[in-house]
Amino acid sequence: MKQSILLFLLIGSATLYAQSPKFHDAMSQAITELEKDTTVEQLMAVSNRFERIALAEKDQWLPYYYAAYARSIAGFITTDKSKVDEVLDGAQKFADIADSLSPGNSEVVLLKGMVLAGRISVDPMSRGQQFGMQSGMLMNQAMQLNPENPRAYLMIGQGLFYTPEQFGGGKDKGCAMLEQSRMKFETFEPESDIHPNWGENLLGQMMAPCGSGSSVPHQE
């Protein structure tokens, strides 16, 4: 009996080990594709690719995270506002699964806040207060969960940047938070080469007007 159990464990370990490089390679290739994608169609396609990886590795939060992330970006750049909610519904679904697999994860909580922020664009006048507050709470929670996460400061700073001063935002507050993000990026090291490591390019674009008197960069 002991020998059978030991053999089972050895076979299980060998199978897990054999799957790991395959999973890593699939993720790495999909992330490389994601970094190049710029259209809604491309982002939806790579989201589907991450979903296929997730279905093969159901206990891994990262493919669900990236499937949601790709759709959240697609939602932000979708010009047909009647389709935004449908795109973000998929992002929300995948983000919720990632959250269940990795509870209390700063990256996942931040992503859930981003999905809510994306819904505001459908009708800012009617949705701004509700989704803006919910999104802000999640982003602040993400920062509290991991104070060294530069993406949390980046997304909070972006939100402040585009929020009028009379509503608690403004360029000065946004730039101050973006500066904190810049400092966090200087020391940030992802857990691996397939863990979240995006944001520096966006930060550079957002910080361009800070302290220069330039106009606020265009937000898609």
For each predicted feature, which ranges?
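Bacterial Sec-dependent N-terminal signal peptides
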Residues: 1-23
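Amphipathic alpha-helical repeat scaffolds of TPR domains
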Residues: 20-33, 56-78, 103-122, 148-163, ...
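Helix-turn-helix repeat elements of alpha-solenoid scaffolds
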Residues: 36-49, 83-93, 128-136, 175-182
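Canonical positions in the second alpha-helix
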Residues: 53, 98, 141-142, 181
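Hydrophobic, well-structured mid-protein blocks that either form specific transmembrane helices
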Residues: 85-138
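A contiguous pocket-lining binding segment that forms or flanks enzyme active sites
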Residues: 127-165
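Terminal, low-structured helical/coil segments at or just beyond the last alpha-helical repeat
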Residues: 172-175, 180-220
